[in-house]
Every structure is written in structure tokens, then in C-alpha cells.
């Protein structure tokens, strides 16, 4: 089937398209803006902190109300109020870098949030309030009345958690325990003394109960928040239920999580087989992200692999496909943005916890899943292997059996090799550090270290149909013909025939 083109195919986008782009998803706010955006609480936050400049961070779906909210706050406080949108990474994260560019000394974050601890600026969260039908929830909940319930809510339905708690107790559920959000976060300049299983949320249970005795009831739709809590609590609780206030349906998530964890474990195996790993920076504001970056880089080097550090902003398959030599990516981001479904990507993308598992000698996994940076750092320090000088020799780099390819794989490209350099410079100066030895026209060793970048370049270079024999000398040089095609000088003569074909 063919089509006729009425105009040339555009090879580039219109530069004005981004300015004319309409926001696809806009949330219609019903009710008074002062109540919905919690203006009074925001004013108290600004005045109590004596802030001179405040950044209002809005997600795309709430940008339509940003001007009105900023105008109301400007009339109520003396601080300079500025609007912040189009964040470099996920809208659930606080964009401290953009706020500092605006010389802001505090941030008010609107909409759904991952509640990751910040490192420099104080933050006030305004989650918003979406409706919920408690009668539908009561009708859908059919678990036994003597069940222990841990109530966890999406940030946008957190306001209704007290009403939900009362409704459950009215039904006869007396053993209900709720989690609490940290709606105001101060920057963590020192190491956190307490780590929470759910980032930004706290809950307490009686000493006689453990999480294995609990049924976790999550209030909210399918979202990155649900995925992060589900992955981190799948092996900790007895049962996991989620109620979607938008569709008024309740789902038992436990039956689906096992398959998700198996897919994540397959990514860990592919990461273990990788020799070149890219560390993608997905946040610049989450507390201790630099510590995680440095620790992962050290672990990759100690494992004999090659690390590359990348900062590409918001991820998409086209960006990461430019780095073909990288075999696996690890994303350093908040707990909600780090769980990437890498089916559309050219290479697998894992979390810092999964990378630590892949690089450790003990590959056992009991379905635990860690997203907190503090917990990942503790685990990585415990899994820290020997120094590279102790393990990265060609003799000790034993291959491992890959469950993905079914073959033995040696994924330590940065191992140190004992290379004998035979170049002219090396003979004159044995200490020369710039000498390169080419082995069989296929691999390169620089300073005695195998270079994966050079090997990848060699694999992409065209070497011809026949292999080059290094011992073959140059061909003998003969004088060519002269003249025109109709008749070359000396063509057909006895002397030329004898010269070309021999006697």
C-alpha cells in the first residue's frame, strides 16, 4: 500500500511548538482555592520561618491555578513569591536546584509527592484533596473483622484518613493502625538517625504485633507511590489490598507482586553479566544522593567493571540508546521514580539496591526490596568487597554462569593485565605510560588495563571479509599499463606476456 506525499517530510521539530503546546491533563479544582490549596497554612509557614523568597512548585495538572494562588499569597505575605514549574526530573520530587536559581529560601510543593528527604531547603507540602466514597469502600472490604489493618493513603487522600479510620471501626474492624505523613520537612544536613520503611511516613505498632500479622490497606489509584510501597512491603506484610477511589474497586495486590519481583530479579541477573554500567543521576535534591553515587561507583570499580556517570534529565529510550557501549543502567532517583519499566529501553535499568545485589557474591534474595538511600548505603557498606588490586587480576577473574544466556561470562573488563609492550617507544623507555599494544587487531590494553571502550570501538570497525595475516609481507610492485582502452602500449607483445605471466 502506497501513499503520495503532498509536502516534504519534516526532519526537525518547529521551535515554537513547545510554546504552543497545550497541557494534556488538567485537574479541575472544585471549591474555594483558599481551602483547596491551604492558603492559611502556607501563610503560617512563610511567616513563622521569616522567609524572604518562596518558590511555589506546581505540577503540570495544577498550573492553571498557579497564577491565582501566587496572587493570593502575595497579598498576604511580604515575601517574594515565585512560580516554579517544568521540573528537571519527576514532579513528585522537590526541585531544590531550580529553587536556588531563583534565590528561594523555602519551597511550597503542590500535588502528589514522593516525600523524599531534602538536603538544603525547608519544604511545605500541599497535597490537594480528591473525593472518596466511603460507602463504596465499606461495601468492597470483605476481609475478616478480626484482621489487623495498617492504613496507608496516597498523599491526595490523606486528608480523609481519619474519616476512613472511623468508617472501618464502625464496620467492626477494631485493630486498625494508621500511618502519618510528614507534611513539613526540614533539610537533613546530618545523617538521619532513624530510617522509615515508607519514605516520609511513620507508623507504630504494638509490641505484640509485627508486620507479618498485618493486612496493609492502601487508599489510592495505581501510581508510582503504590508501586514503591508494594515492592518494599510485599515480603513484610501478610496481605496487601488497595482501594482505588477513582474506580471504587479493591484489588489484592499480593498476587501480582510475585511476578513483578521475578522480572526485577531477571534485571539483576542481566546487571551481573554487564561489564560496562552507566550511573544515571535522576535527582539533585534527595538527601545523600551523592553518597550513593560515590559508593556505587566504588563498588563497580571494585567488581572489575567500567562505570560511566550520566546526567540526562528526564529519561526516555532515545536518550539512553545513544550510549550503546553501556550494557546496564542504574538510576539514582527517589523511591518512586527509580522503578522504571525498562521494556521500551535498549538496556535494562535497575535501582541502587538491585545493583548492590548484582555486585555482591551472595546472590540470594528473600523478596526484600529497599528504596531508601540510607538503607542502601548500609547494605552496600556491608557488601563492600576487597580492593581492586586484590581481585582484579586475570588469574583470579573467574567467570560465572549466566542464567540469562546459559553460558559462562567474565564481566570484569577493567581487570589489570600483565602486558608486554613491544613498541619502539617502549623499548626506549620502559616507564612510558602512553604505550598501547594491539592484540590480534581485536582488543586493546592501555597501561596494562583492558579498555572496554576500545573493544567496543573495535567491534564497530569494519575489518573486511578476510582476516589480515600479520606475517604476510607487501606485494611486489609492477609497472602498470599506459595508453588508451583501444590499445595499450606494448599490448600483445611477447615481452609483455612474458612479464605478466612468466615464461
UniProtKB/Swiss-Prot annotation:
- The answer to whether the entry has keyword Cytoplasm is yes
Q: Which cofactor does it need?
A: [4Fe-4S] cluster
Q: What does the Swiss-Prot or TrEMBL cofactor note state?
A: Binds 1 [4Fe-4S] cluster per subunit. The cluster facilitates the reduction of the catalytic iron-sulfur cluster in the dph1 subunit.
Which intervals carry biased composition (Basic and acidic residues)? 492-503
Give the UniProt subcellular location, in the record's own words.
Answer: Cytoplasm
The alphabetical list of record keywords is: Cytoplasm, Iron, Iron-sulfur, Metal-binding
Chain positions recorded as [4Fe-4S] cluster binding sites = 93, 114, 334
What is an example of a GO molecular function annotated in this UniProt entry? Answer: metal ion binding
Which family does the UniProt entry place this protein in? Answer: Belongs to the DPH1/DPH2 family. DPH2 subfamily.
Q: Which PANTHER family match?
A: 2-(3-AMINO-3-CARBOXYPROPYL)HISTIDINE SYNTHASE SUBUNIT 2 (PTHR10762:SF2), DIPHTHAMIDE BIOSYNTHESIS PROTEIN (PTHR10762)
Record-given protein name = 2-(3-amino-3-carboxypropyl)histidine synthase subunit 2
* Source organism of this protein record: Schizosaccharomyces pombe (strain 972 / ATCC 24843)
Gene that this sequence comes from: dph2
